[in-house]
Amino acid sequence: MIKRRGNVEIRVYYESVRTLRSRSHLKPSDRQQSPGHRVFPGSPGFRDHPENLGNPEYRELPETPGYRVTPGIHDNPGSPGLPGSPGPHAPPANHVRLAGLYSPGKYAPLASPDPFSPQDGAYARARVGLHTAVRVPPTGSPTHTHLRHDPGDEPTSDDSGLYPLDARALAHLVMLPADHRAFFRTVVEVSRMCAANVRDPPPPATGAMLGRHARLVHTQWLRANQETSPLWPWRTAAINFITTMAPRVQTHRHMHDLLMACAFWCCLTHASTCSYAGLYSTHCLHLFGAFGCGDPALTPPLC
């Protein structure tokens, strides 16, 4: 239709409006099954609704990846619908655009959210276990912890004379036979090590090592001295004590007695000129009475 207003030509187009079908013939149960019930586009009940049967726009809706009808869910009218839905015709949980409509609602994911993402910060995080909880010291307690020493670890007056063999004892090497020097050097080094770590228990493996080394050098000495030697009873007493004590070292007193017996065995080869004779007289007296070195006990007369 063309209208003229002065020198202006106006073209007016009219579009026929489709009259709405009367809903009077529908039963109330068909129009509204329950208060607040609404059929959403894209649902199986939307296409079968009497109002939309003749509408070509909703006759065939394309199946979108976000909406797929699960077989068997909507076949039964009494079916509860999708999991988590309030009614038999609940809207799809996925947020897809169906027939020009968009559902603004957002459902919480079923999987565990990332606790470090900002959008999931409202989710409850796992509780900290008791074994990982930080223990707070009680009020009034000191903020720092002092190491507590066992009084038994402190050196006593009885232990003050332990391990007298030091670096000066290495001067004996030049006066010992060549086959005795390695053993004596080992004895001095172990004595220095134990003196520096007197607060810790002596290592048992060290005592066993000294026992093996002592038996080796004693066997070599016996093979080289087939004839009777005046040193035989003294060295026999020393090696017997070493063999017995070596596997049983538990305290520093045990290790001290073992080392002094080993050094005494070595220094017997220059007993007349040894500068440590007074030291052995103090620390090795137990060897003579323990193994019968000396005059045999006299049998008391019968009458």
UniProtKB/Swiss-Prot annotation:
It comes from the Viruses. Residues 46-62 have a biased composition (Basic and acidic residues). Residues 20-97, 134-160 are annotated as: Disordered. Keywords: Host nucleus, Late protein, Metal-binding, Virion, Virion tegument, Zinc, Zinc-finger. InterPro entries: EHV_Unk. Its main location: virion. One of its GO terms (molecular function) is zinc ion binding. Phosphorylated. It is found in: Virion tegument; Host nucleus matrix. Pfam families: Gene66. A zinc finger (unnamed) spans 262-274. One of its GO terms (cellular component) is viral tegument. Induction: Expressed late in the infection cycle. Belongs to the herpesviridae US10 family. This is Virion protein US10. It comes from Human herpesvirus 1 (strain F) (HHV-1). The gene is US10.
